[in-house]
Amino acid sequence: MIKDVETKGYVKLYEPGINDLIEIDDYTLLNNEDRLRDNSRTDVNTFLRQKLDVVHTFLHQKYIKPTYPNSECTYWNIWDGVDRDNEGWHTDFMEGYDVFFLYYFDTTKEETGGHIAFKWEDGEAQFQPVKGDLFLVANKRGFWHKAGATDIQRRVASFNFKTNAI
């Protein structure tokens, strides 16, 4: 199933238990300005950092390592909102990882915006993420993604991996 990411550039999954572990409502994300939304290790509470590390390892062991045995975790980010830069089709391949998960802590609706869309050679797909949605995304040429503008709370974490596939 995870290898499907190499066909369309994404795989949609659902992991509601991550919300129970993270308890995101207990934390404030400091960085929330356009183009400065990413909150990394030094920007978040120690307990939230530990929880995100656990989830990163969990996702690696459950989804990535069985398909890519030489893979490694790189880093994670967490943010609220959508940067204008991310509203257009793009890849993140300059960031140095091969695949990544997007995990959604909040529910979006068509009328509130905040969708996620994927594009590959001969198709496109768009989703309104709900709390607990998890998307595995290919970070290589030929696959693009974009986020829809929104003014609602839209907290998302990215868990990034190198597959080290030959």
Model-flagged regions — what are they?
Residues 1-69, 75:
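Non-heme Fe(II)/2-oxoglutarate
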